[in-house]
Swiss-Prot record:
It comes from the Eukaryota. Pfam families: 3Beta_HSD. NAD(+) binds at K156. The gene is SDR42E1. GO terms for biological process: steroid biosynthetic process. CDD domains: 3b-HSD_like_1_SDR_e (cd09812). This is Short-chain dehydrogenase/reductase family 42E member 1. It comes from Bos taurus. InterPro entries: 3Beta_OHSteriod_DH/Estase (IPR002225), Lipid_A_modif_metabolic_enz (IPR050177), NAD(P)-bd_dom_sf (IPR036291).
Amino acid sequence: MDSHKSPKETVLITGGGGYFGFRLGCALNLLGVHVILFDISHPAQTIPEGIRFILGDIRCLSDIENAFQGVDVACVFHIASYGMSGREQLNRSLIEEINVGGTDNILQACRRRGVPRLVYTSTFNVIFGGQVIRNGDESLPYLPLHLHPDHYSRTKSIAEKKVLSANGTALERGGGVLSTCALRPAGIYGPGEQRHLPRIVSYIEKGLFRFVYGDPKSLVEFVHVDNLVQAHILASEALKANKGHIAAGQPYFISDGRPVNNFEFFRPLVEGLGYKFPSTRLPLTLIYCFAFLTEMTHFILGRLYNFQPFLTRTEVYKTGVTHYFSLEKARKELGYEAQPFDLQEAVEWFKAHGHGRRPGSCDSKCLVWDGLVILLVVTVVLVWLLPSVILSM
C-alpha cells in the first residue's frame, strides 16, 4: 500500500491485539494507512500514534458493525482465530464459535458496510492433516473435514471456503462487489512472538526438552512475522482494480521458502540460550500415541483441571511429518519475495527478558524429567501392547 497512492485509506484488522495483527497494523501505519485494531484483548505493546484500537468480539455482529461507524473501511484483514495449539486446541465449542461464527459475522459486516476487500489469514492445515506433502501447491484439494485430527484445522478449512466463496458477492452499500483472498501461512516466528516460542522456551527451561522425534530428514516450514506482513499487504493490493483483482477468490501458501527439519530449526534457540540440544530420538508413533492419551485425559479431566498438554496429535504431525509448499503462485501473482531471517532476533529477545541457562539451574530438574521420559515410554508401550497381550491369552 503506497502512502502516495492511498494516504487516507482505512483498514480494520481483526485480532489486531495479537502478535501478528499488531505487527501488521504498525507496518500499515508507517505506510500512511489509517489502521483500526479490533480485538477482544488490548495489545501487550504501546499503541503507536495514528492507530485506533477498538475492544470487541467477532462473535458479536454489533461489535463489528460498531467498529465501522463513521469510517469507510477499504479492507478488512481477518486474522482473529482460536484453538491453534495447546489446550486451546481441545475447546471445540469456542473454536467453532470464533473461527466459523466469527467469520460469518465478518463477511456479513463487510457486505452490509460496503467493504470492498477482505484478506483472510488461514493456515497450512486446511490441506495438511498428517500426510507427507513435498512442494505442494494451491491445486491440492482440501483435506476432507472428517480427516482433520483437530477442530481448529477443521474450522479454519470451513472458514476459508466461506471467505473464498464470498468473493464477488454484491455489497449492500456503495455498489460494487466484495473481493476476497486467503493466505495460508506456515508457523509464525519472530522476536516477541507470544504463542509458540514462549511455550518452547518454557519446556526448555523446565528440562522437558530431553528428546526429539521422527525422521531426522523430515522437513517443515516457518514464516517470519515480517514476511507474513509483507504477504498480507501485497494481497490487499492484489485485490484492487488497478491490479486486475488478480488475487480475488484465490488462496496462497506463505512461508520463508526454506524447508527445514523442525528440531534443527530450533537448535539455535536451544543452544543460544545456553542449553544442550538433546541427542535422544524417539519414534514418531510413540509420541503420537502419547499425544492421543494426553488428549483423552484432557477430555475426561479438562473441566476439573484444564492442564496444558505437552503435545497434541496435530502438533506431533506438524513437527514430525514432512510438509512444505511452493511459493510460486504468491511470487507470480502477489509479487511476494521472502526475505532471509533466522532465530537470532528471538534469542536476543529472550535473553533481554531474563531467559537463558544459569550454571547448575537445570541439573536436578533434568534428572527428574529423564525419569519421567522413561516412564512415558514404558506407559505408552504398555498401553499399546496390552490389547495384543489380552487377545493372545
